[in-house]
Every structure is written in C-alpha cells, then in structure tokens.
Amino acid sequence: MNTNWILNCPAPKCGKLAEGYYNAGPMLADDRNGTTKEDSKMQLIFDVTKADFNEYVQNLKTLGVEGYLERNLGADNFFAFHYAGKHYHVNYLATRGEMRIIEDAAYVSCKDFGYEAMGTEQTILYQYALYYDPDNNVTDKTVNCGMLYIIKLSDNSLVMMDAGHIRQWNEEAMNGLWQFLHKITNTPQDGIIRIAGWYFTHAHDDHTDGCTKLLHRYHNQIQLERVLFNFPFRGYTGGYSDTVYDMKKAVSTWYPNAKLLKLHTGQKFNLADMTIEVLYTHEDAATKEALGKVSLRDFNCTSSILKATIDGKTVMLLGDTNIETEALLAKYSDKSLWKADMVQLAHHCFNFLDTMYEWIAAPVVIVPNSYGGAHQPENVAKLAGAEKYVQDNQIYYEGSGTYGLIPTPDGWKQVEFYPLVGGEYDFSGF
C-alpha cells in the first residue's frame, strides 16, 4: 500500500490505496466556488478482505479509539469512531473487496445526533398534499414534481422530509402548512413548533424550497433541532439547484446550533420512537478508478435512501432514485435488506424501478405526484412496478390530499385525510 494517505486517522496496513480521494461535500457551507473546510473526504482501499477490516478495527481499538457504531448490513460491515476531533466512518464492502474510510470535519456523530423517547402521542406519517400541474407539465406557475412528508413522533415533535418546489407554495398553501403543523401538534398560535429533524433526499429545488419559505416566514416560532442529508461536492457534478443554497443559508442563519448529520451508508439512529437506517448515499457510487468525480449521469441518483421503522413497521424512502442506483444495488446489495411495509414511490413516478420494487414488495405505496401525473401514458408502466404489490387499494397520491397513516399490527393504515390547500403559484417568493 502506498503512502498517499491524507486523512487524519491511522491508515490501514492492507490492500491497495486508490489514487486521490472522493470529496463527499459539505453540509451547510456554500461550495459553488470550490472546496470548503467542511467537506467530507473519502479514501478507498481495494483488494481487502473481511479479516483485513477486522484487523484494522482491532488496531484502532488497541490505540484507544472508541467506536460508536459497529454493525453489518448483510455481508457489509461498518465501524464509526471519533479521532482527533473528527468523525470517521469505515465501510467494508464484501462483494467489492473494498474498504472506504470517510472523514467528517464539522458534524456530530450519529450517536450524538439521535435521541430516544417514547411519548404518549400516536406516531403518524403524513404525505402532505402539494399542487401538481393538472396536465403533468411545468409552467411559470406549476410543476409536476416536489414532495413533502411529515412524521409526527410520539413525543409530539416533527420530522420533515423534503419540502416541495417554490411554485407549490403560494401564500395560501404556505399558510395552510403552518396551520396544519399547529393542528397536528395541538400547538397554540403563539406557541413553538418543534421540528426534531429535517431530512433532504438530494439537492434539487423541488425538495428544498418549501423549507426555505417556511423558515423565512416563521423561524421565530420554529425550533429546528437537527438537519440531515448528504449532498455531493458541487464541483464534481452538474444538476444542483441554486436555491438549495438559500435553504442552507436559512438554516445556518437562524439555527446555528442545530445538529448536522452527514449521512453515510450503514448508519443507524433514533429520532424519538422512529429508527432510521441509511441504505445508500452517492458515496456508494464512487469508483476506485475515478474518485475525483460523481460517477452518476443522473443527479437524481445522488438521492440518499433511508429505511424508517416505527412500532415494528417499515417505510422505504427512495427520494428521486433512478436506474443507476438500482443497477448498483442489484450488483452489490443484499436484497433481503430492502423488504418494507410501505414505499415512497421514487422520483414522482418518472422512472422504471421494477427490480427495486420487487425487493421492497410493499403492500402500501405513497406517490409524490398527482393521480393524473402518475397515470400519464408514459408513467403507467412505471407505476405498475410498485402497484402490483399493493393490497386493499392502499396507494395514495400526494396531489389528492394529505393522508395520515399509522403503523398497526396489520401494517400501515390510513386514519386521517385533509383536502389540498393552495393552487397555482402567485410569485410571492421566499
């Protein structure tokens, strides 16, 4: 193994070190003009075995390093530790014969990020209604994408997932969301809305804009405790939306003490009574031959994939996952990890993901699009890949209204419904 080791943790003494490193990107720093001091870095060692991984972990422990995450996903193994003021995440990927070590410079560990609590409230997942173009088009007043999921946890805090496009948030819609957050948490109008975490699947505007607008309007009445995502380095790839940086600025300006978690495959943590497992990030697509770029043609494949478990029932959160991610996982992932009780249909029903939906085989499907958008002639066959596993007609469209679903011994069940609030964009901005 050569000596081109740039990370600040001890280097493994096995295998071959790939040339260079993969810049996995920062959290809230603006990287439009180049690298930042917050960037996470990953180095890759190949031609290694599980015995090599075990030896490296043991050597770290001999040095007094205390790991805070040690687990496996199928044949893959993960070890996370703190060393010299930074956090490190080690992945051993068995089918590739690789060990990947990621250095996080500016964030908390997944152990310190999460918390466990069992309150008295019924935990409920809402697919929050957004307005979609009725003809599945994109105009100056409408879009055919965007999504927002809200999970009210048992301690009456909220976890938000993505946020919708600015063109889905006219003033009526934004006020409707604000009133909805008060209603489901039974918070008085002059009270504080507690958001335990806001998760963003990837760096597209139809997944971040609504957060920016909500924080601009109501940050004085919102307690935002945590933010979690993994966006790649801007310099490695096209496809970023510039308004994503407005979201970053809003969070850093109004919530400088919010805990930030850079997501990595293998992490597992709790938010109150919900357990989150990270099954994929864009880091998994990096190759030893080309660490200096994102090896994905479609930026949507930088979407992280999470599996959430609440009261024993699971939901697979796919973001805008596309076929490149599916092909990578088909080659390297343990398929048994993917079975779930509910699935968020990927990328607004724009992609064929029949293989992935077969692994998941979810009897409940939540669709981040309208019924009309999902049933456009070009989308019907894409929907069918997930729809074939649906039981009791449990397929819910975000454009039809807000659906509230709870975990029960018999699976996820719809228990609440609220009509769509809002319509075409009114150019009210953030």
Question: Regions from the language model: what does each represent?
Answer:
Residues 1-42:
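Compositionally biased P/S/T/G-rich terminal and signal peptide-adjacent segments
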Residues 47-70:
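Amphipathic alpha-helical segments
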Residues 106-193, 262-339, 407-430:
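Core dinuclear metal-dependent hydrolase active-site scaffold
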Residues 145, 167, 203-209, 233-237, ...:
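Active-site environment of divalent metal-dependent phosphoester hydrolases
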Residues 150, 158-162, 194-201, 225-230, ...:
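Structural recognition of the beta-strand scaffold that forms the well-ordered cores
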Residues 168-229, 332-350, 361-365:
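Active-site metal-binding motif and surrounding structural segment of the metallo-beta-lactamase
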Residues 205-220, 236-247, 355-358, 377-381:
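Metal-dependent catalytic neighborhoods of phosphoester/phosphodiester hydrolases
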Residues 226, 232-285, 297-298, 364-430:
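Binuclear metal-ion centers of metallo-dependent hydrolases, dominated by the metallo-beta-lactamase
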